[in-house]
């Protein structure tokens, strides 16, 4: 793929090229950001369609920043390697250099990264989350004008906060028939009083850790977001009626956070009360009920706080309501450190064809602009995407969605779509 030439984009050449013109974002003692007018922001193209959608994102975000600030602010983009390209160039799928520059940069963005199946290779996405303690996966879901499978898609405007470090994703598993599984089974039966009928000899076991500390920091982030953005109805979900020690505890800890001095008087927990000015309402909802409510009345919820596994389910269902993950941005956020990303996979079947939908990564780029305080530029991106979709212009998947609903649409390639959006940035 031929790369578009950007004077403020520094591609990897034997090592990361750090521009002298740029400055690194700084993390203050209170974990807020000190953002210069010329921040260095690293990007990872990713695998599959990653390079194509990254080029599109760079064009759109650069255009929005230039149109908004007329040169007084500029991002200096630095390419880092991870995934297939990193393995090809360095022999490692996640080079130490990438981790070092991400640490110094505080904020970054990446395309999709694959994990080879059956080769014993650990997920790079998981490794990055662990390295920088990105403990909240934040996924806004809203309609931009695309064809959708549900009527009145404007009803969908919510943000899923998925806890990113706890739960069954901890990866502590014991496969059926192994000595380890046998040892754990015997311990549970003999020492912990577990019933033998629940743990037959051929049982496999996965551990589901959930801690008070990790839960509460995640809930605080979600409640702060809701209060700062005037999001009134907040749900904390889980199967606490079944898994009392984990998901039940998660819900209880969420309500304890609501009673902390920071939130006292700002978070309404009475089921019969309505939130007033400057308040939000926190409601407990069983996970299966939430899945049903998202389909039947998505407008009921503004923010959903979830555990890792339930958040995985809920965020994908919510995305499906507005056309799928190709329209949804995402940010992995910790205490200051943040890595924004596309929500979809590598899509190797269309890689290199120049037809991939770049909106997920582009909207993640706009989300990143908001995160560093450049909200005016972010809004220009959102407005331009809406204008472009309102004219029924998009990559083949977007155009096909319109056509299936009897709407005439214009199908364009990835970069042409990015150019159409950029032309509409005002």
Swiss-Prot record:
On cofactor binding, the record's note says: Binds 1 Mg(2+) or Mn(2+) ion per subunit.
Keyword RNA-binding recorded:
no
Which cofactors, by name? Mg(2+); Mn(2+)
Q: What is its EC number?
A: 1.1.1.42
Q: Which UniProt keywords apply?
A: Glyoxylate bypass, Magnesium, Manganese, Metal-binding, NADP, Oxidoreductase, Tricarboxylic acid cycle
Q: Which Gene3D superfamilies match?
A: Isopropylmalate Dehydrogenase (3.40.718.10)
Q: What class of enzyme is it?
A: oxidoreductase
Site residues, Critical for catalysis:
169, 239
Q: Where does D-threo-isocitrate bind?
A: 123, 125, 129, 139, 162
Note the InterPro entries from the entry: IsoCit/isopropylmalate_DH_CS (IPR019818), Isocitrate_DH_NADP_dimer_prok (IPR004439), IsoPropMal-DH-like_dom (IPR024084)
Q: Name one GO molecular function term.
A: magnesium ion binding
Among Pfam families, the record links this protein to: Iso_dh
Does the record bear NADP in its keywords?
yes
| Residues reported to bind NADP(+) | 344-350, 357, 404
The record lists its disulfide bonds as none
Q: How does it assemble?
A: Homodimer.
* UniProt function note: Catalyzes the oxidative decarboxylation of isocitrate to 2-oxoglutarate and carbon dioxide with the concomitant reduction of NADP(+).
Q: What is this protein called?
A: Isocitrate dehydrogenase [NADP]
Name its species.
Answer: Aquifex aeolicus (strain VF5)
Its lineage reads: Bacteria, Pseudomonadati, Aquificota, Aquificia, Aquificales
Gene encoding this polypeptide? icd
């Amino acid at each position: 793929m031929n790369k578009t030439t950007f004077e403020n984009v520094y591609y990897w050449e034997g090592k990361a090229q750090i521009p002298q013109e740029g400055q690194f974002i700084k993390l203050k003692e209170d974990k807020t950001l000190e953002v210069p007018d010329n921040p260095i922001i690293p990007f990872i193209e990713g695998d599959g369609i990653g390079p194509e959608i990254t080029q599109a994102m760079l064009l759109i975000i650069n255009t929005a920043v230039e149109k908004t600030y007329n040169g007084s602010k500029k991002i200096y983009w630095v390419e880092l390697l991870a995934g297939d390209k990193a393995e090809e160039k360095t022999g490692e799928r996640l080079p130490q250099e990438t981790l070092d520059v991400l640490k110094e940069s505080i904020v970054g963005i990446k395309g999709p990264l694959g994990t080879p199946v059956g080769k014993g290779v650990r997920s790079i996405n998981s490794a990055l989350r662990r390295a920088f303690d990105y403990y909240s996966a934040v996924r806004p879901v809203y309609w931009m004008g695309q064809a959708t499978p549900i009527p009145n898609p404007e009803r969908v405007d919510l943000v899923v906060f998925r806890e990113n470090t706890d739960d069954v994703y901890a990866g502590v598993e014991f496969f059926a028939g192994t000595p380890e599984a046998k040892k754990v089974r015997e311990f549970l039966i003999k020492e912990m009083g577990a019933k033998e009928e629940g743990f037959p000899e051929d049982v496999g076991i996965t551990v589901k850790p959930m801690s008070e500390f990790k839960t509460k920091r995640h809930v605080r982030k979600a409640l702060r977001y809701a209060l700062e953005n005037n999001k009134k109805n907040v749900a904390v979900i889980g199967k606490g009626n079944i898994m009392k020690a984990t998901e039940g505890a998660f819900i209880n800890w969420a309500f304890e956070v609501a009673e902390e001095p920071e939130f006292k008087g700002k978070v309404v927990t009475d089921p019969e009360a309505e939130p007033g000015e400057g308040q939000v309402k926190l409601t407990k909802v069983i996970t299966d009920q939430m899945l049903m409510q998202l389909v039947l009345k998505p407008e009921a919820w503004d923010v959903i706080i979830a555990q890792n596994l339930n958040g995985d389910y809920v965020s994908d269902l919510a995305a499906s309501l507005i056309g799928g993950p190709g329209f949804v941005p995402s940010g992995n956020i910790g205490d200051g450190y943040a890595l924004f990303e596309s929500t979809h996979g590598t899509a190797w079947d269309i890689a290199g064809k120049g037809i991939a939908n770049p909106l997920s990564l582009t909207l993640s780029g706009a989300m990143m602009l908001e995160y560093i305080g450049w909200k005016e530029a972010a809004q220009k991106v959102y407005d331009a995407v809406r204008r472009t979709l309102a004219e029924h212009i998009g990559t083949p998947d977007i155009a096909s969605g319109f056509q299936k609903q009897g709407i005439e649409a214009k199908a364009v390639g990835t970069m042409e779509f990015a150019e159409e959006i950029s032309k509409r940035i005002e």
